[in-house]
Regions:
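Active-site-adjacent structural elements in enzyme catalytic cores
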Residues: 1-327
Length: 327
C-alpha cells in the first residue's frame, strides 16, 4: 500500500489525477492549487464546469490556506471541526484567492473538509497542498464505493486507482453553510444530507434544508444524480406501482423481508436488500451504491426502490434515491 501511496503523491505532484479511497466514496483527486490538474477532473468525469468541487485538507491548520473564517462563526466552526473532523462533514466558507475559480465554479465560496480516511489523509499531507476530489465516477452516475467500481467508471481515463477496499460510510459527506445569529444558536443551511445527521448537528445549531436555486451553491444539488443506466423509480407506497405486461422489474428493498408489503406486491425478477433482515440504516447507507450498481447489471427493464424511514442516515439515503429517480 505504501508503494501505491507514493505513486499517488508523485502523480499528483506532476499535475495528474488519481482515484483515492475516502470514508464516504472513492474520490477523483487533483492538486487543488493546480488549475490544469483540476481541469483533468472535469474532463475524466465529463463533469460540467458549473458544478463546484470539495477541497480536502490534511490538517485543521491548513483550513486558512483555502478559506477565510469570519469571526462571527469561528467559535461554531471550531465546535464542528472538533466534533466531526476528520470526517464526513463539509463546510462552505468564503474562499481565499489561492483557490482557483475552476474549483468553485466561479463562486466566492468553497466547500472544505478533512477526510477521515487515513490513506487519503496521508497522501494529502505528503502532497503538501489541498486536494480537490469529487466522486470518482462519470458525471451523474452511481458513486463508487470500491476500487472495482472506479475501474468500471474511469478505467483507461486515469493513471492510478489506489485500492483500500470498501468505503466505511457509503454516501457522500454532509454539506452545510453556517449563518450566525446574535444571541442565538447559528443556523446550519443543509446543502446535502450525508453521514453526519441533522440530529447530530442540532447539538450546535438549528438545521434548515436548502432548496436548490438557479445557480449551484455546492456539489450534490442537481435534481438528477447518482443514477444507474437502467430506468430507476422510487415509489413512496405500493399503490403507486402499476407494472407493465412483459417488463422485468427488480425491487431495491430496505430489508427484503418476504412478508413486507413492497416485496409481496409483485412477482419481482430480483429483490435485493440494503440491510437484509435487520433494517439498519448504517448498513443500508454503506450498501446503497453497491446494490444500485449490482442491480444495474441485471438486465432489468426498470428498478423500483422502496423508501426508508427519514430519520438519521435515512435522510441521506432518501436524498440519493430521489435524485437517482429524477429524469
Amino acid at each position: 500500500m505504501k508503494e501505491a501511496q507514493n505513486a499517488a503523491v508523485e502523480l499528483l505532484q506532476q499535475g495528474e489525477v488519481v482515484a483515492l479511497p475516502t470514508e464516504t466514496v472513492y474520490g477523483l483527486a487533483a492538486d487543488a492549487f493546480n488549475p490544469a490538474a483540476v481541469a483533468k477532473i472535469f474532463a475524466a468525469k465529463e463533469r460540467p464546469d458549473f458544478d463546484p468541487l470539495i477541497v480536502h485538507i490534511a490538517t485543521v491548520r491548513d483550513l486558512e490556506r483555502v478559506a477565510i473564517v469570519p469571526e462571527d462563526i469561528r467559535h461554531t466552526l471550531n465546535q464542528l471541526t472538533t466534533e466531526f473532523w476528520p470526517g464526513p462533514l463539509t463546510v462552505i466558507l468564503p474562499k481565499t484567492p489561492e483557490v482557483p475559480d475552476l474549483v468553485t465554479s466561479g463562486l466566492s465560496t468553497v466547500g472544505v473538509r478533512q477526510s477521515g480516511h487515513p490513506i487519503f489523509r496521508a497522501i494529502n499531507k505528503a502532497l503538501g497542498n489541498p486536494i480537490a476530489a469529487p466522486s470518482a465516477n462519470r458525471f451523474g452516475r452511481i458513486s463508487p464505493t470500491s476500487a472495482s467500481a472506479v475501474m468500471k467508471e474511469l478505467g483507461g481515463r486515469i493513471p492510478l486507482i489506489v485500492d483500500a477496499g470498501a468505503c466505511s460510510e457509503g454516501v457522500e459527506s454532509t454539506i452545510i453553510r453556517i449563518e450566525p445569529r446574535e444571541g442565538k444558536k447559528p443556523i446550519f443551511h443543509l446543502h446535502r444530507a450525508g453521514p453526519i445527521s441533522k440530529e447530530q448537528l442540532q447539538k450546535f445549531g438549528k438545521v434548515q434544508a436548502v432548496k436548490p436555486g438557479d445557480k449551484l451553491q455546492s456539489p450534490g444539488q442537481l435534481e438528477s444524480h447518482y443514477a444507474p443506466l437502467t430506468p430507476f423509480r422510487l415509489i413512496e407506497k405500493p399503490s403507486d406501482f402499476t407494472p407493465e405486461l412483459g417488463k422485468r422489474y427488480g425491487l431495491l428493498s430496505y430489508t427484503g423481508e418476504e412478508g413486507g408489503e413492497f416485496v409481496r406486491m409483485h412477482r419481482w425478477e430480483n429483490v435485493v436488500a440494503l440491510s437484509p433482515g435487520s433494517g439498519k440504516l448504517a448498513e443500508a447507507a454503506v450498501r446503497l451504491f453497491y446494490v444500485m450498481r449490482e442491480m444495474d447489471e441485471m438486465g432489468l427493464d426498470e428498478i423500483i426502490a422502496e423508501p426508508v424511514s427519514e430519520v438519521g442516515l435515512g435522510v441521506a439515503i432518501m436524498d440519493r434515491l430521489r435524485r437517482a429517480s429524477a429524469r
